């Protein structure tokens, strides 16, 4: 009964991990619809205004036939332009719905499985691992490798390559000292960023201002003041302290001696890295993406199931080679949680909750403090070809007499 419960698939827990799989296409569909709606509203307003002016001028005789024809040509051109834009939005909507259908079908496959022993579960689990690996690589800039894996596994509709490629491009531009693409992204998502109370646009405008001051010439100083009046002053109510510091930077240039730390921080080259990080955080929050890669979440869950209070310790083991050769000492981890690859990730996860204990019968305590079941010691001694009355530690290889062993439970 216990084995059956352990092998049973918990569909709710799987869906918790795979929430972003459905959420991102949904958020992108909303964004696509808002963009299409804005285009229709904007172009319709312009067309209606021009149509009314043309009709009124034509009826009043104030507009010549040539101007009427010219206005009609302008309206036709605008309509064609709007049609092209709407076609682009329609194609994007079709792509996103196709993506969403594929992801729902992928999750529906899991709903038909009820045990990890199902032959189909291994293939499904492998596909999910591939998805998590692509997500991890895209988040860390390994775009070529991520695309290669997605192509090999034929799972383009299950991963968000285009979204992360766009994010990666803007992040790299910030790391290379350019705010142009990031500001364009902020302009496209102005309303949403305002709802999230994001300060990204303000930080980008401040960086533009700082770069003008860094040049430290009279013409650039005037340009910086003009920039501050237009783009930084409107944020005075939201970020009063930062705006005052921006004004003070006019009197504190990066070449000044004994530059106060708070002003030196604004001129630090590290600010580009911080801006890139701020952009990624705003991007993920806007699209409802997790802060950390889903691979970390999945690994943390598995690590927590294995972690015990004995973890993060090491045990020195001594292995002896053939007679006459020196002994070598090596340090091996007690469990996989303590391995170099997983140690850091496992540090902050909780310990496993075990409601049932599984102990061998007739536990025996070895002189080195290790405990094993008698059956295991007997089996290992037979395999090792030990003399009668001797046992061997399964980990360290140390040999002891049976008389030196103590029963754990009398």
From Swiss-Prot:
SMART domains: CRA (SM00757), CTLH (SM00668). A zinc finger (RING-Gid-type) spans 335-396. Residues 310-330 are annotated as: Disordered. Residues 314-330 have a biased composition (Polar residues). Keywords: Cytoplasm, Metal-binding, Nucleus, Zinc, Zinc-finger. InterPro entries: CRA_dom, CTLH/CRA, CTLH_C, Fyv10_fam, LisH, ZF_RING_GID. It is found in: Cytoplasm; Nucleus. Pfam families: CTLH. GO terms for biological process: negative regulation of gluconeogenesis; proteasome-mediated ubiquitin-dependent protein catabolic process. It comes from the Eukaryota. Residues 125-157 form the LisH domain. Residues 163-220 form the CTLH domain. Its main location: cytoplasm. GO terms for molecular function: ubiquitin protein ligase activity; zinc ion binding. GO terms for cellular component: cytoplasm; GID complex; nucleus. Belongs to the FYV10 family. Involved in the proteasome-dependent degradation of fructose-1,6-bisphosphatase. This is Protein fyv-10. It comes from Neurospora crassa (strain ATCC 24698 / 74-OR23-1A / CBS 708.71 / DSM 1257 / FGSC 987).
């Amino acid at each position: 009964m216990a084995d059956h419960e352990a092998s049973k698939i918990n569909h709710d827990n799987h869906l918790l991990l795979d929430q972003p799989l459905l959420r991102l296409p949904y958020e992108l569909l909303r964004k696509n619809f808002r963009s299409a709606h804005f285009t229709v509203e904007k172009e319709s307003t312009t067309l209606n205004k021009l149509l009314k002016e043309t009709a009124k001028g034509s009826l009043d005789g104030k507009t010549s036939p040539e101007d009427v024809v010219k206005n009609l040509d302008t309206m036709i051109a605008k309509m064609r332009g709007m049609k092209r834009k709407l076609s682009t939005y329609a194609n994007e909507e079709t792509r996103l719905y196709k993506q969403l259908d594929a992801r729902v079908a992928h999750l529906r496959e899991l709903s038909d499985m009820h045990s990890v022993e199902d032959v189909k579960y291994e293939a499904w689990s492998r596909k999910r691992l591939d998805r998590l690996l692509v997500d991890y690589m895209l988040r860390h800039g390994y775009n070529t490798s991520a695309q290669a894996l997605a192509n090999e596994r034929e799972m383009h509709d299950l991963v968000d390559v285009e979204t992360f490629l766009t994010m990666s491009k803007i992040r790299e531009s910030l790391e290379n000292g350019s705010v142009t693409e990031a500001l364009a992204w902020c302009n496209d998502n102005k309303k949403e960023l305002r709802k999230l109370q994001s300060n990204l646009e303000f930080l980008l405008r401040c960086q533009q201002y700082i770069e003008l001051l860094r040049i430290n010439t009279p013409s650039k100083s005037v340009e910086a003041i003009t920039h501050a009046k237009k783009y930084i002053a409107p944020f005075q109510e939201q970020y009063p302290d930062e705006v005052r510091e921006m004004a003070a930077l006019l009197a504190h240039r990066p070449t000044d001696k004994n530059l106060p730390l708070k002003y030196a921080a604004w001129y630090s080259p590290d600010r580009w890295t911080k801006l890139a990080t701020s952009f990624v955080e705003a991007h993920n929050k806007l699209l409802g993406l997790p802060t950390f890669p889903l691979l970390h979440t999945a690994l943390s869950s598995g690590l927590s199931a294995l972690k015990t209070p004995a973890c993060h310790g090491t045990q020195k083991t001594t292995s002896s080679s053939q007679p006459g050769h020196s002994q070598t000492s090596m340090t091996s981890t007690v469990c996989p949680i303590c391995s170099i690859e997983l140690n850091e990730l496992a540090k902050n996860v909780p310990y496993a909750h075990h409601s049932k204990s599984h102990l061998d019968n007739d536990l025996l305590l070895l002189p080195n403090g290790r405990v094993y079941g008698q059956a295991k010691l007997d089996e290992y001694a037979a395999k090792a070809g030990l003399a009668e009355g001797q046992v061997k530690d399964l980990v360290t290889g140390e040999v002891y007499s049976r008389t030196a062993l103590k029963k754990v439970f009398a």
